[in-house]
């Protein structure tokens, strides 16, 4: 069971409990919501008592998966240039916590949606991994000051000592079926590049795995 949690699960755990310090009754927004970290984080957040768990993704099929299988209370298909408005429409009261797997416009939207004293865990920057030019910085960075926000990046390798803590918390929930690890498996080592590019384009649900068997 433990091996199915993996680095994505530990990343989600650290982001929620140590960096963003999610509290029961709070609302959380997760970008790249169907990916390895996002799919774990939503299920963890529900167990930790989050009131609203909002996720953004690339298409309607994935959006349905977020609410049907992964524990999200709300989901939307993001549209370039409209993410802030979309997020505001879904959760007009604002968010307390943001798990940022994307950067760029998604981070900008989260800053706009934050309540005072909101906390963001900066995990990745998918928006710039394959971009020809880096995305512009969020226009509203001064809101970090005005709302007393906390934005903190981290590397999961610095938190490996928390693996046992995570396993003690999550394994009973996996065994009971309340948490279901998500994988997208590509078979054949010769398809590794294809699998990687698919992951960058959001083609996976949960952890992207290449099996050489």
Task: Go through the PLM ranges and name each one.
Residues 3-80:
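Mid-domain Rossmann-like dinucleotide-binding core that forms the NAD(H)/NADP(H) cofactor-binding site
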Residues 34, 80, 102-103, 124:
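Short glycine-/small-residue-rich Rossmann-like dinucleotide-binding loops
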Residues 73-79, 184-191:
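Short acidic-hydrophobic, aromatic-tinged amphipathic segments that line or gate anion-handling sites
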Residues 82-93:
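Short amphipathic alpha-helix with an adjacent loop that forms part of the alpha/beta core around
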């Amino acid at each position: 069971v433990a091996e199915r949690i993996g680095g994505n699960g530990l990343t989600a755990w650290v982001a929620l409990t140590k960096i963003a310090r999610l509290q029961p009754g709070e609302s959380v927004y997760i970008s790249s919501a169907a990916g390895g970290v996002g799919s774990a984080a939503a299920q963890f957040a529900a167990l930790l008592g989050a009131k609203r768990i909002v996720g953004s993704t690339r298409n309607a099929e994935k959006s349905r998966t977020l609410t049907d299988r992964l524990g999200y209370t709300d989901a939307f298909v993001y549209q370039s240039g409209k993410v802030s408005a979309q997020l505001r429409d879904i959760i007009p009261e604002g968010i307390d916590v943001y798990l940022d797997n994307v950067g760029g416009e998604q981070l900008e939207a989260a800053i706009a949606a934050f309540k005072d004293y909101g906390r963001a865990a900066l995990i990745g920057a998918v928006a710039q991994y394959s971009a020809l030019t880096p995305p512009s910085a969020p226009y509203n960075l001064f809101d970090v000051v005005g709302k007393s926000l906390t934005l903190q990046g981290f590397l999961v390798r610095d938190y490996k000592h928390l693996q046992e803590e995570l396993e003690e918390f999550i394994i009973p929930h996996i065994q009971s079926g309340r948490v279901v690890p998500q994988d997208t498996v590509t078979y054949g080592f010769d398809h590794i590049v294809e699998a990687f590019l698919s992951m960058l384009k959001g083609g996976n649900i949960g952890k992207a795995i290449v099996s050489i068997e």
